[in-house]
Each structure stands twice: as C-alpha cells, then as structure tokens.
C-alpha cells in the first residue's frame, strides 16, 4: 500500500505546516463557501423604545397580550404614530394608495412585529414588504396574473362541510375562524379571512360557529379514511383557549385521528398570547390528552424572515415543547423581496433551529391570488433556490420548497411533469382524487397547469400574454 501511505504522509506534512506556519485565526476555509455559517444577525429582542410611538411603553405592557392586541396598527394614522418621522412621506403615500386600489387584506400588525422592522429602511424592510405592502411594491404591468383567483386553491369548493376542506385522501383542513392577530398581505385565504377592503368583499361563514364545529366533528367520525387534521383558520391564536381546547380535545377522542396540527402565525407575531397562564394551561392539557390517546399533536407556525425571530418567540416555543407537543414546525412562504435568496432562507432556517427549536419544514410558493405577482417567483427560480440550500442543514431540517398546485396540492418544485419556460406554464400530475373528483375518471391522467409570473418570462412569452392568446387551462 505504498501509494496510500505516501498520500497519508503528504497530508500529515501539510497539517504540520499549517499548524506551525499559519496562525489559526487566518485559516478560514469555510469562508470560500457560497454561504457561511453562522448567520451574522444577533439573536436579540429589539428595543421597542427606539420607536417614537413605543418610547414610554413599559416591559410589563410589552409582555401583555392584551396590550399588544389593543395597540396593533390598523391604519395609516396609527402606523405613523409608531414610526413618526422615521417613515418616509412617499412610503406613506404609496401605502395609502395601495390600501385603496390593490390591498386584498386590511392592515393589522401587532407591536411585536412592528418592532422587528428596520425603522431606518422601511422601504427595503422584508417584513414591512409583505405585512404592509405599498403600491410601488406591486408590479406596474402585471399586479395580478390573468389566472389569479380569490380562492386560488379552491378550498371552499372542496368543503365536505362548511369550513372543512377535504383535498387529500387521508388529510383535512379545518378552518375554525376567519380572523387572525395579524393580517399578511399575501394571505392565501384572502377570500374569507379578515375585514372587507375596497377591492374585496369577503365571503362569510353561514353556519353558527357551534353548528359548524359539530358538523366538522360528525364528518370526522363518519369518515374513517381521515387520520390527519390541520386546525387552522384564520389563526387559532384568535380563538378563546376554552373553545380551542374543547374542539381539539374532541378531535383527539376520534378513533381514526392519529395526527393533529395546530396552525398559527401568532406564535411568532404575538408570542405574548402563548405566554398567558390560561393559554399555557389549556395547551398543556391538550398535549397530555393527545399523548394519552396516542395522537401526535404538533404546532405549525408561519415565519418568513429571520428578523421576525426573537428571544420572546423562543421562550414561547420552548414552553410549548416542554409540555409534550410532538414538534413545532415552520411553514414559510417564498416571496420576492422577502426571502428569495439562499442566504435569507438559510439564515431563517438556522435561526429557527439554533435559537427557537423550531423545525424548518416547508416554503410554499406564493399562491396565485389577485395582486400578488410582485411576490411570486417562477418555478425555475424556486428550483434554483432549493438546489442552493441543500447540504448546509441536517437532512431532517432542510426545508422543502413546494408548489401548491390548484386541484392537485403540494408538490416539490422538482416534481413538475413538464415545463414550458417560454410561456411560463408548468404541468403537474397527481396520484389521488380530491374531494370533488371521486367520480372523475380522468382526474389521475390530467395534467394541471401552474403559471409563472409573466414579468419573469422571455420577451416572446410576455408578448404572448399581452396579446391575450389563450393559454390552455388543462393540457
């Protein structure tokens, strides 16, 4: 084995030379990598008193969920009072116009989220960019895709009973309410969630809440093929803990239910809610009940940028994990101007893992709702990002970028069946029928389209759409 021995001797000589001739502080081999760990942002709670509107707020007030809700920003006047002269006049003007002409969600931002914005660059701040969109943020020619829809995933079409979407064979989505402690500009349920805005008169549940919950429970009991329930809305953080505990507790008792996921952005946007004694007590009772019934009970949160994560969020997460929840996972949304770089996705994923003990899980491509084109990425851009983040995180914590294809469901972005890059149309297939296709013989043979933002297409593709040429709805 002389060749191997010679190679080993050479490696030892190089190691000795490095240790004797080069100071260790100058050896930085990892800095040649496209991404360098750890993230450069300090994990701290920003001082809210730096903002003019919060200058006199005490720590006790800041930690109060009631105070946070009462002082959430609901309009431009309140936003200006928080930031004072720090918010540029042209940004105020642009947000005002957007609220009148483009916004699909009303403004609602808790102080906790406002405090994570960069007050020295509000135009460029990623959290402001998706929570409080400005007219100038939107694409001037294509604010909406021609195929955008209010309920782009057709969730209401798949309601087995009001508020219960049965899209996958073994999984359902229970929309318990239509409000949140914060309203995201890109909300995929903009058709149902939140207050009316000039552009959108929201649909409303017709059944009383109690009757709706009873109908959902009855359906789950009568449908043994369902084993997995996502409890969402809206946001469960807006449901009184007694109501949440009653509903989820009853779902836990159903024999065929093995997995329950509680979905909330509030754990990031309003962690104070989950640090209240009554909420913690109710959540602990649910965790213990789930364990006793051999049901996996997990929490899914929605964080899009590392700046949103603070020690207060980590405290709330760790308290919940200590109670016996199966896991707390993050499902972010991939958005241009927010997290559309490998660095942004990796910074967020590492901060989730290292500081909050939240598992990076999914990044969804932004759905094709009206006036969302400036946030959306093309499928090939998402594929490139997925490639770029591989190899840095543990395999079990590497988030998957997925496309939620209408009438199909989640698909990893590399699962596309065919892709016309020139026209920006990708085609996808599926191996199951949704709740509205049980008698459709062609459902498993059909190819389902998804559309790239038109401004990402080559000139010829853009001209195709400008000319109004018909794009096939189904291939």
Task: For every predicted segment, state its role.
Residues 106-109, 157-190:
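N-terminal pre-triad scaffold of radical SAM enzymes
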Residues 1-166:
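Flexible, acidic/Gly-rich N-terminal and inter-domain linker regions that tether
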């Amino acid at each position: 084995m002389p060749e191997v021995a010679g190679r080993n001797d050479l490696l030892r000589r190089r190691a000795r030379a490095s240790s004797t001739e080069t100071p260790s502080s100058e050896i930085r081999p990892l800095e040649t990598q496209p991404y360098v760990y750890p993230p450069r942002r300090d994990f701290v709670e920003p001082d809210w008193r730096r903002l003019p509107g919060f200058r006199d707020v005490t720590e006790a007030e800041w930690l109060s969920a009631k105070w946070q809700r009462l002082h959430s920003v609901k309009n431009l006047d309140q936003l200006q009072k928080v930031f004072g002269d720090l918010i540029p006049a042209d940004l105020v003007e642009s947000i005002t116009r957007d609220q009148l002409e483009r916004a699909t969600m009303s403004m609602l931002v808790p102080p906790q989220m406002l405090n994570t914005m960069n007050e020295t660059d509000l135009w460029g701040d990623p959290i402001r960019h998706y929570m409080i969109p400005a007219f100038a943020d939107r694409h001037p020619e294509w604010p909406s895709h021609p195929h955008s829809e209010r309920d782009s995933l057709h969730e209401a079409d798949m309601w087995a009973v009001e508020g219960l979407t049965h899209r996958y064979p073994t999984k359902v989505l229970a929309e318990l309410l239509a409000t949140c402690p914060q309203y995201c500009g890109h909300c995929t349920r903009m058709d149902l969630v939140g207050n009316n805005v000039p552009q959108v008169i929201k649909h409303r549940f017709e059944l009383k809440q109690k009757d709706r919950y009873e109908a959902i429970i009855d359906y789950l009991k009568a449908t043994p093929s369902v084993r997995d329930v996502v409890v969402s809305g809206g946001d469960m953080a807006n449901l009184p803990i007694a109501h949440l505990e009653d509903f989820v507790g009853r779902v836990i008792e159903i024999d065929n239910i093995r997995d329950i996921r509680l979905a909330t952005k509030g754990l990031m946007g309003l962690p104070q809610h989950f640090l209240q004694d009554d909420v913690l007590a109710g959540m602990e009772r649910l965790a213990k009940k789930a364990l006793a019934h051999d049901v996996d009970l997990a929490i899914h949160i929605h964080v899009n940028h590392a700046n949103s994560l603070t020690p207060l969020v980590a405290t709330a997460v760790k308290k919940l994990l200590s109670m016996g929840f199966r896991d707390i996972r993050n499902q972010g949304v991939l958005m241009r101007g927010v997290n559309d770089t490998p660095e942004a996705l990796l910074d967020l994923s590492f901060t989730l893992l290292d500081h909050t003990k939240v598992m990076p899980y999914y990044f969804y491509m932004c759905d094709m709702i009206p006036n969302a084109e400036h946030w959306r990425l093309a499928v090939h851009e998402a594929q490139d990002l997925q490639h770029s983040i591989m190899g840095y995180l543990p395999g079990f914590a590497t988030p998957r970028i997925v496309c939620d294809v209408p009438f199909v469901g989640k698909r990893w972005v590399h699962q596309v069946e065919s892709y016309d890059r020139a026209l920006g149309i990708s085609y996808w297939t599926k191996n199951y029928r949704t709740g509205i296709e049980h008698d459709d013989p062609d459902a498993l043979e059909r190819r389902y389209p998804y559309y790239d933002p038109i401004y990402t297409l080559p000139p010829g593709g853009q001209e195709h759409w400008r000319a109004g040429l018909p794009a096939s709805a189904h291939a």
